[in-house]
Each structure stands twice: as C-alpha cells, then as structure tokens.
Regions:
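Primarily the internal scaffold of c-type cytochrome electron-transfer domains
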Residues: 1-16, 41-382, 386, 405, ...
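Compact, glycine/acidic-enriched structural inserts
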Residues: 26-27
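Amphipathic alpha-helical scaffolding segments comprising HEAT/armadillo-like alpha-solenoid repeats
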Residues: 358-367, 388-400, 419-428
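Conserved hydrophobic register position within alpha-solenoid helical repeats
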Residues: 379, 410-411
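Alpha-helical scaffold repeats of the Armadillo/HEAT/TPR superfamily
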Residues: 394, 423-447
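Eukaryotic intrinsically disordered, low-complexity regulatory tails and linkers enriched
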Residues: 447-467
C-alpha cells in the first residue's frame, strides 16, 4: 500500500472470484482482533466447546479441520459446567455484552458469547494492543510475582482439560506449535480447495495454499511432535531474511539430521535425494517444504506441511508436480518416470492425463490453462522467476483471471520477464488491461484476446464458508 500508493488485495483473505460492486466493510473486531492482539486463550476455545454448527469467528481453534491423530480434545470436568458458564458470562460482561438467557444450556451460552465477542470486542478491551508476552505464554501472573517460575505453554484451567484425542503424552514441541496455530491457522477463507486434500468441506481437508496457515500445515506433517515452529523461527523478533534463506540450503540440513542422522553423510544424502548433495537439490527443505504457497508480496512462500514430493496424493491430485518447480523444462512423463525409477512409486497415467491434458505436457504450462486458481498462481510465479519467456502469452492470460489475486501474481511475472514495470490497473475491464499490457510488452498478447471477466456481480452465496 505505502510503496505503490494504492490499495492492494491482501494475500490470504481474498482468494475469491471477481465480485463487482463489493463494498469495503471489514470490521476490525470481527476479522483481525483475535490474531493480531493478546487475547485470552479461553476465548479462542468457545467454538470448539460449543461443537459443530456454532457461530464462527477469526482466531477460533479449529481442531475439527485436522486429522483425528493430530487433534486435541477440550473437555469440561464433571463439576465444571457451572464454572465454564460463569467464566463465559464474565468475559461477555467485560466487553459490555448482554448476558445469555436464563436456562440456556452450555451450547447456548457459548453461542451467545461468540456473537457478543464478534460484535463488541475492541481496542478498549485490551491491556495492550498487539502481540504481548501472554499471547503465547498464557496467564503468567506467577512468573511476574516470582521470575524463577517460568511461564508454561500448556493450557491450565480449574474446569477445562486439553488432551491429545489419539491419546499419549503431549510433547513440549506440540504445545509450542499449538500456541503458534492459534493465529497461523488460516485455511483458505472462502476458497474451497486445498493441497492434497478433499477441500475445506471434505472429510480430509489438506494444507492451505495461502500465507498465515503455516502452523496448521506444520501440524499435518510428520515432524510436529519433535520439532517446533521455534526451531526455525524466533518468536521474539522478526526473522532475518538471510537466516531463512540459509535454512533452504544444504547448511540448513543440520536441523533435519538431528532426527534423521542417517542422511548426514554426503553419500547417503545423494542416494536418498538423487541430486548433488552439495547443490540446491541436496537441500532437505527444497524438496520437503517447496515454495508453493501465496505470500502477501505476490511471491511464493514455503508450504509448511513437511511431506514427500513423490507422495501420490500430491502427484496425482495437485498441479503442478513439485519437481517442476525447479525442473521447469521437463514434461509430466519425464518427472513421474524419474520418481518411479528413484523411489519405486507407480503413478496413474490416466489421472495425470486428466490433470494436464497429456503426460507429454510441461506441468507448469499446462497448469496455466487447466489449473485451479491457487495452482495457476504457483505456475505464474515460478515461470516468471525462471525467466521462461516462451510462457509469456500464457502468463499474460492470467492478467484477466476471474480471481483478482492471481492477476497480481501474473503482473509481477510479466514485469519480471519484461524487465520493467507496466502501468496496468488490474481492476479495469479486460480490453483495457490487454491494451495496457500490449503497450508495455507487445509479445504478451500477440494474437488472441482472453475472454471477458464475469459481468454479473457475485453474491455472498457464490463463495463457500465465512472467513
């Protein structure tokens, strides 16, 4: 906003189709307040305690969108119902809300409380604005009284218990990751699709394609019991770009070999990765946390579900194949053939042909034409950064994508390929956008003009669930 002196679309919350006539109307207390400030953990649990069908709100714990083996269960003790309802009533009164009706059961009290919080919680209710110590460390009165008592990450309550639904002990790393996931859990807003899943409303929602969902995505992977977000990120200061970049090199493998020491020797890593162990392909993160999520600056960030690039759920459901993020010149057949030879997989060629049109297609270029919106954004960004000038016409078509966010990725890619900025207003009509881009980069639209954007204003029911 400040650099361009113009309004821009925020990366994670607006992956929705074109909606002409939409008026700005975000309410801070409803959409921002719970993640960008220090709010009692208890307030984030009301939706989970009320159960399915409860009113939704930003900042609520969303364990139901995790696989069962990753969920926590929040339970009220046998004698705790009255204490719970009294605590909810006290929170509602603190924000100036009205009490629940006499005789309401626990669910009714919680649902009423959620509506009151959504409409009334504001700046006047905070001890401090922004993220303070207790946003992560919970109530820390004992630590203030006696600094020798260290704050804890585990939730504590006289009437409420938290436990792993699958049983077993909860590790400290899991507790830390849960703290991060209170805010970094945005899934896909109204956008229904996910990575390697059935979508938001399916039985197995996968990983997010947007920024701010990193902690939830991390919980989906296999490392979240032993490794915490704080292993790579300093929660007390902004990460230095150089430090994050180093993690994506072979030097960053030192983090991974703490638990996977068998890959520390270079020959073992080469046999595992089938790449030069000293080069970019020898980085653990490069393959297991690929850059394919949409960030706020119209550049890609890393997908935080630590997994396998050869996983059939990724290869046969998602576009583009992750190996194509580096190997932009290879075809689908080239890439899956290598994965089958290297790791003993067997992929469904018919499913791949359905995704890409043909297995002889290059995954990124085919994704431009056939992909879902989040997949198209990835293809656009990668082809632009790779300077694939032959893909320019396909990238330029995304400048009139029905999803405005994808257009911004396309504009950045076109400008990267052209090596200069283009004065293009992406909120204009299709003919105006095409004319402006042709004036800047004639090769972008050599012949055909893309179809016009949707003319009918979209309504709220055109999208999926609330944010």
């Amino acid at each position: 906003v400040f650099e361009t002196r113009s309004f821009r679309l925020k990366g994670y919350s607006v992956l929705v189709g074109e909606r002409p006539g939409l008026r700005a109307g975000g309410v801070w207390s409803e959409t921002c307040v719970f993640c960008h400030n220090t709010v009692p953990y208890f307030d984030a649990l009301w939706g989970e305690l009320a159960g399915p069908g409860a009113p939704t709100y930003q900042g609520t714990v969303v364990d139901r969108l995790l696989p069962r083996e990753r969920r926590w269960r929040y339970e009220v003790g046998a004698d705790g119902d009255g204490l719970l309802q009294s605590a909810v009533a006290a929170e509602v009164a603190a924000v100036g809300g009205t009490p629940a009706r006499d005789g309401d059961d626990r669910r009714g009290v919680l649902a009423h409380g959620i509506r009151e919080l959504r409409s009334r919680f504001g700046a006047r209710n905070f001890v401090e604005i922004g993220i303070g110590c207790e946003a992560c460390h919970g109530g820390s009165r004992e630590h203030v009284v006696d600094p020798r008592v260290h704050p804890d990450f585990a939730p504590r309550s006289a009437f409420l218990n938290a436990r792993a639904e699958a049983g077993g002990d909860v590790t400290r790393a899991e507790q830390v990751n849960r703290v991060c996931a209170r805010c970094h859990q945005v899934l896909f807003s109204r956008y229904p699709y996910t990575w390697e899943g059935e979508g938001r409303r399916g039985g197995k929602p996968g990983g997010s394609s947007i920024t701010s969902g990193e902690a939830r995505d991390f919980l989906l992977g296999g490392c979240a019991r032993q490794m915490s977000c704080a292993t790579c990120h300093d929660p007390h200061t902004e990460d230095r770009r150089a430090d994050l970049d180093r993690l994506a090199t072979t030097a960053g493998n030192a983090v991974c070999v703490r638990c996977h020491p068998q890959y520390a020797p270079a020959p073992a890593l080469a046999a595992h990765a089938h790449h030069d162990p000293t080069g970019a392909g020898g980085s653990c993160i490069a393959c297991h946390m690929p850059k394919k999520n949409m960030g706020l600056g119209y550049a890609l960030t890393r997908y935080h579900r630590i997994g396998l690039p050869d996983d059939p759920a990724r290869v046969e459901r998602d576009r583009p194949i992750e190996c194509a993020l580096c190997h932009t010149d290879k075809t689908v057949a080239d890439l899956v053939g290598k994965m089958e030879a290297w790791w003993g997989r067997k992929y469904d060629r018919a499913a791949l042909a359905n995704l890409y049109g043909t297995v002889d297609a290059r995954p990124l270029q085919a994704t431009l034409m056939r992909g879902k919106a989040h997949e198209q954004a990835v293809a656009v960004a990668v082809l632009g950064e790779a300077r694939r000038t032959e893909a320019l016409p396909g990238i330029a078509r995304q400048l009139v994508n029905p999803f405005p966010l994808v257009r911004y990725y396309a504009k950045r890619a076109v400008e990267t390929l052209a090596d200069r900025p283009c004065a293009v207003d992406l909120d204009r009509t299709t003919p105006e956008i095409v004319a402006a881009v042709r004036a800047c980069v004639p090769a972008a639209f050599p012949e055909t003009v893309p179809a016009a954007l949707p003319a009918k204003p979209r309504t709220r029911t055109d999208d999926t669930d609330e944010d």
